[in-house]
């Protein structure tokens, strides 16, 4: 999200919850903080072009894949800040040049299915 765009890599002390530690571990296995920043920069440029959020672009990019039937959007009880923003996904059309930009970055990353296996395998 925009929260992490152009930020320094967090230290262990910055990762104050188990969830943050897990997310950072996934980033490290995927390709590291530098590549994550590169992806966020590309997503941000595309988001600015479409007047939406980085999360909208990332969500739509995944939803448009033929093998994907849905995404689970994280939410916290009582926090409604992102409801309206998340709805933008349904009207968003990502252009082919946008897809190529995102794919150019993700092609540099490790395939997490090869690294850790299926969803939840990181806990086994």
Task: Indicate where each model-derived feature is located.
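Hydrophobic, secondary-structure "cap" segments at the distal end of domains
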Residues: 1, 38, 60-61
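Short, solvent-exposed beta-strand-terminating loops
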Residues: 1-8
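Short acidic/histidine-rich active-site segments
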Residues: 4, 72-75
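Terminal-tail/helix-coil boundary detector
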Residues: 8-45, 49, 64-70, 82-124
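Glycine/threonine-rich phosphate-binding loop and adjacent beta-strand/alpha-helix elements that clamp
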Residues: 57
